[in-house]
């Protein structure tokens, strides 16, 4: 994978999770393992184990392998693996860009920006989507034509809590249950497993950025999504929205046409096939003012 941080430093690497997923999705042996792993009883058993005290013994090795600095977090001792995985960071380590016109990142992760068109296809964990397939809602998908999809991929070493990106009024959460597909040996290929994973979204109506769709996608096995507020109501920029339990996961934002000017580096990096490393609370864009104001009207490049 090719990553670039906001200062322009490039990293080319493949972590253990990337290697495992490539094996599971792209060769016959891996797909046979995948057929077993996605069975409900296996996923349930794994989830139960990760909440036990015994699972806490896995934490020290994980911390060492992934070079995680526990001093950044509110506690350093954990009762289970999931207690560790959902650990809270110290607030000062993720300051929120406070200007009203500034849009912030909802989470830590590796970001890709894509323009949304009728023929747009987005890749998440080697699976191809249209916006309509992602939302299972044709009418809602059309609301974001011409805008941006911001896909933030979390790996196991990332902070797995996420926040609201602006002040606004949220809708009720929409839950799309997951459907696990198995392999197709005759075609020697895997059916699109990841896009059928459980996912959840809410619409955030804002004064400055239009209506932002915020979606969370669970991981392949036990990546449970926990959102704190299920119903509609007001929320604040930087307020914690929820968290993922164990598993690399994905946060997706859909932005309406003409409402947000994303930062140039995010778009340019995406055009050059780099994922941009971002942190929760940091600036990723700003309100796009209309032509009538005579401000902030620099032409935006197209993302692929």
Residues covered by each model-derived region:
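Contiguous, well-folded functional domains in the mature portion of proteins
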Residues: 1-304
């Amino acid at each position: 994978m090719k990553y670039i941080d906001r200062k322009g430093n490039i990293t080319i690497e493949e972590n253990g999770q990337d290697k495992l997923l490539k094996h599971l999705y792209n060769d016959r042996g891996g797909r046979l393992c995948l057929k077993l792993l996605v069975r409900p009883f296996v996923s349930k058993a794994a989830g139960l184990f990760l909440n036990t005290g015994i699972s806490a013994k896995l934490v020290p090795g994980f911390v060492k392998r992934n070079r995680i600095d526990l001093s950044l977090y509110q506690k350093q001792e954990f009762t289970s693996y999931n207690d560790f995985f959902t650990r809270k960071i110290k607030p000062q380590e993720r300051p929120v860009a406070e200007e009203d016109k500034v849009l912030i990142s909802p989470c830590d992760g590796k970001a890709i920006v894509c323009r949304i068109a009728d023929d747009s296809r987005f890749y998440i964990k080697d699976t191809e989507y249209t916006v309509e397939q992602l939302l299972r809602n044709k009418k809602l998908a059309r609301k974001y034509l011409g805008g941006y999809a911001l896909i933030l991929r979390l790996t196991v070493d990332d902070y797995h809590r996420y926040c609201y990106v602006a002040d606004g009024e949220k809708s009720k959460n929409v839950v799309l249950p997951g459907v696990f597909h198995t392999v197709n040996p005759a075609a020697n290929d895997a059916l699109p497993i990841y896009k059928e994973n459980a996912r959840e979204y809410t619409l955030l109506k804002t004064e400055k950025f239009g209506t932002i769709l915020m979606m969370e996608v669970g991981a392949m096995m036990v990546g449970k999504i926990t959102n704190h507020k299920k119903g509609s109501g007001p929320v604040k920029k930087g307020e914690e929205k929820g968290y993922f339990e164990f598993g690399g996961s994905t946060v997706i934002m859909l932005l309406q046409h003409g409402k947000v000017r994303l930062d140039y580096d995010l778009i340019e990096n995406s055009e050059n096939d780099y994922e941009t490393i971002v942190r929760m609370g940091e600036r990723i864009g700003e309100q796009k003012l209309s032509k009538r104001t005579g401000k902030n009207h620099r032409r935006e490049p197209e993302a692929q």
